[in-house]
């Protein structure tokens, strides 16, 4: 689901 993917992408960006 794209909403879940967006959350993971956001978390990856924040932790970068």
UniProtKB/Swiss-Prot annotation:
Keywords recorded for this protein, A-Z: Activator, AIDS, Apoptosis, Cell cycle, Host nucleus, Host-virus interaction, Ion channel, Ion transport, Transcription, Transcription regulation, Transport, Viral penetration into host nucleus, Virion, Virus entry into host cell
UniProt KW Transferase keyword: no
Chief localisation class: virion
Residues that span the membrane, as ranges: none
UniProt GO BP: monoatomic ion transmembrane transport; symbiont entry into host cell; viral penetration into host nucleus
One cellular-component annotation, GO: host cell nucleus
Compartments reported by the entry: Virion; Host nucleus; Host extracellular space
Assembly and oligomerization: Homooligomer, may form homodimer. Interacts with p6-gag region of the Pr55 Gag precursor protein through a (Leu-X-X)4 motif near the C terminus of the P6gag protein. Interacts with host SLC25A4/ANT1, SLC25A5/ANT2, SLC25A6/ANT3, SP1, CDC25C, RAD23A/HHR23A, COPS6/HVIP, TFIIB, UNG, SF3B2/SAP145, KPNA1 and KPNA2. Interacts with host VPRBP/DCAF1, leading to hijack the CUL4A-RBX1-DDB1-DCAF1/VPRBP complex, mediate ubiquitination of host proteins such as TERT and ZGPAT and arrest the cell cycle in G2 phase. Interacts with ANKHD1.
Misc. remarks from the entry: HIV-1 lineages are divided in three main groups, M (for Major), O (for Outlier), and N (for New, or Non-M, Non-O). The vast majority of strains found worldwide belong to the group M. Group O seems to be endemic to and largely confined to Cameroon and neighboring countries in West Central Africa, where these viruses represent a small minority of HIV-1 strains. The group N is represented by a limited number of isolates from Cameroonian persons. The group M is further subdivided in 9 clades or subtypes (A to D, F to H, J and K).
Function: Involved in the transport of the viral pre-integration (PIC) complex to the nucleus during the early stages of the infection. This function is crucial for viral infection of non-dividing macrophages. May interact with karyopherin alpha/KPNA1 and KPNA2 to increase their affinity for proteins containing basic-type nuclear localization signal, including the viral matrix protein MA, thus facilitating the translocation of the viral genome into the nucleus. May also act directly at the nuclear pore complex, by binding nucleoporins phenylalanine-glycine (FG)-repeat regions.
Protein name: Protein Vpr
Protein's organism: Human immunodeficiency virus type 1 group M subtype B (isolate CDC-451) (HIV-1)
